[in-house]
Amino acid sequence: MDGGKELILSERLLAIAQWIRPGSRVADIGTDHGYLPIWLLQHGRATFIAACDMREGPLEHARRSAEQYGLQEKLSFRLGSGLSCVVPEEIDTIVIAGMGGETILSILEAAPWTNNARYTLLLQPMTKAEVLRPWLSEHGYSFLRERLVLENRTYFPIMALRGGSACRPLSLGQAWGGVALQDDPLQGRALDELLRLRTYALNGLERSVVPKNRERAEQQRAILVQLRQMKGEWLHANGKRN
């Protein structure tokens, strides 16, 4: 390291890093500035890291960051789309963070070998978690745990999963509100925000004169019912009153 300088991660990236077991072999997809791989090496969490990005610019930023901390020789920099630049046998942990849920979905869809119990997946969608969660569960990725991080006044979910499991559908509430967040201290406020946004969406649909929006309004009502139920269960489990 450059004079023993330690990299400080954002709370969102730190939450992901803390879930990576010491000795892991990691692929960081969409590595951007390479901050997560640098932190993992500094703290002895990984024995191998492939820092991957589909654009040369971010990958060059990652190289420069690694040089600043004297770690450029310990990282494998890969230029390629998604997991296309990763050899399945060289890793056991896959991190895909800071992308939209639909983008994460498409990356995994293009790499069916990830649906195997040998791999731990750490996913952090910036948007469309309600699209990503059902797809994962319906394709045999089981949720090991979830947590929320509040960053820039937005609640971001972090998910740990493993492939090779039985496929099962999720409820609307689980798709939107999470699968394993019952004990998360931020879940109550995150559900409040979801309820506010879904109510706003429903109000807009109810004012619409487009026939198709009636069906969409019914779905929003169903989502709201299940989210309210989840909020009640969270309050009960955490000994709180509404």
Task: Give short role names for the model-derived ranges.
Residues D2-E11, A15, S84-C85, E90, ...:
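Class I S-adenosyl-L-methionine
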Residues G23-D32:
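Conserved class I S-adenosyl-L-methionine
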Residues G34, I38:
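Glycine-rich SAM-binding Motif I of class I
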Residues L41-Q42:
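Gly/Ala-rich phosphate-binding loop of Rossmann-like dinucleotide-binding domains
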Residues F48-D53:
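Conserved SAM-binding motif I beta-strand of class I
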Residues R55-G57:
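Conserved SAM/SAH-binding beta-strand->alpha-helix loop
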Residues E60-P88:
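S-adenosyl-L-methionine
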Residues I91-G98:
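Short SAM/SAH-binding signature in class I
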